[in-house]
């Protein structure tokens, strides 16, 4: 393992620890259970899952470090010149599904790839981001989420947040329904436009920002009462989350194609979900407001 890879791995393991601790403290009744695993083809990881906490219905914070002799198709599709190279991939990925429909689902990921071939220079890049999926949107929460994202990006250039915000909006879009999965945040891949130290600093800034972005929202909304109807709407919207993760998500596809651990890969799926045939929210309802007002292409910081 190279010095660079060792530094990234140490950071990711520490990030996993810090996020789990912060989520446990905010929940008050949750405890992550760790499941260490090995990958027969090379590598392994530690999956941490929580279920039936006071706030978190189901959540997972995964670390993985896998390697192999050939990049999977999902990793080389956009860079065909790397096909056939050996690879190492390290990352932390998390999804939090709260009980309450007033607390948004959150997702975050930071990852590092390095592709190597004998006699050639290694090719490395970082990827990741974080995004928010509310069920009953609150403008204050959306602005806060994007403000934290903007501040994390600011030291690396004025164009970084707008570029990766737009990429997030484009990526987390259900093409077959022509609708966003949530209100976005940041998404980026193939980050190596800076030198390694700057790129690594950027990834650390994004990883470290997640707790500051998410926990204040959880704290504000976790005690709000909700109805059976609101819970059913949450489960209906969770169906969109499942559709995206199984059809489009690069991390899911990479994990399955690289022979990753299925239980860890599918940990992102919510525990309860529903689909209703051609269901539509009543015009003017809070449920309709989600799609009419929040799940739109918006600049959340323009007037705030």
Swiss-Prot record:
The active site is at 107 (proton donor). It comes from the Bacteria. One of its GO terms (cellular component) is cytoplasm. The keyword Cytoplasm applies. Its cofactor is a divalent metal cation. Keywords: Cytoplasm, Heme biosynthesis, Metal-binding, Oxidoreductase, Porphyrin biosynthesis. One of its GO terms (molecular function) is protein homodimerization activity. A divalent metal cation binds at residues 97, 107, 146, 176. SUPFAM superfamilies: Coproporphyrinogen III oxidase. It is an enzyme of class 1 (oxidoreductase). Belongs to the aerobic coproporphyrinogen-III oxidase family. This is Oxygen-dependent coproporphyrinogen-III oxidase. It comes from Pseudomonas syringae pv. tomato (strain ATCC BAA-871 / DC3000).
């Amino acid at each position: 393992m190279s010095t660079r890879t060792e530094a990234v791995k140490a950071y990711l393991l520490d990030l996993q620890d810090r996020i789990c601790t912060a989520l446990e403290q905010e929940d008050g009744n949750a405890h992550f259970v760790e499941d260490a695993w090995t990958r027969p083809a090379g590598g392994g990881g530690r999956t941490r899952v929580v279920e039936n906490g006071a706030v978190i219905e189901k959540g997972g914070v995964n670390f993985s470090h896998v390697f192999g002799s050939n990049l999977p198709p999902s990793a080389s599709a956009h860079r065909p010149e790397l096909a056939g190279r050996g690879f190492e991939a390290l990352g932390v990925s998390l999804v939090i599904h709260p009980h309450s429909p007033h607390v948004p689902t959150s997702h975050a990921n930071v990852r590092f790839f390095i592709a190597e071939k004998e006699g050639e220079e290694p090719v490395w890049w970082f990827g990741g981001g974080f995004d928010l999926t509310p069920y009953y949107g609150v403008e204050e929460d959306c602005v806060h989420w994007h403000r934290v994202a903007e501040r994390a990006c600011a030291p690396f250039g004025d164009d970084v947040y707008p570029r990766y915000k737009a990429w997030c909006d484009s990526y987390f879009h259900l093409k077959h329904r022509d609708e966003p999965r949530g209100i976005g945040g940041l998404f980026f891949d193939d980050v190596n436009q800076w030198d390694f130290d700057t790129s690594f600093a950027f990834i650390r800034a994004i990883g470290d920002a997640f707790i500051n972005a998410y926990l204040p929202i959880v704290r504000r909304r976790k005690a709000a009462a909700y109805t059976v109807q609101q819970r059913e709407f949450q489960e209906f919207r969770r169906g969109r989350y499942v559709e995206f993760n199984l059809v489009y998500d690069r991390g899911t596809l990479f994990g399955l194609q690289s022979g990753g651990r299925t239980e860890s890969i599918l940990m992102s799926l919510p525990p309860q979900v529903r689909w209703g045939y051609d269901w539509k929210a009543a015009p003017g309802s809070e449920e309709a407001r989600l799609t009419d007002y929040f799940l739109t292409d918006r600049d959340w910081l323009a007037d705030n």
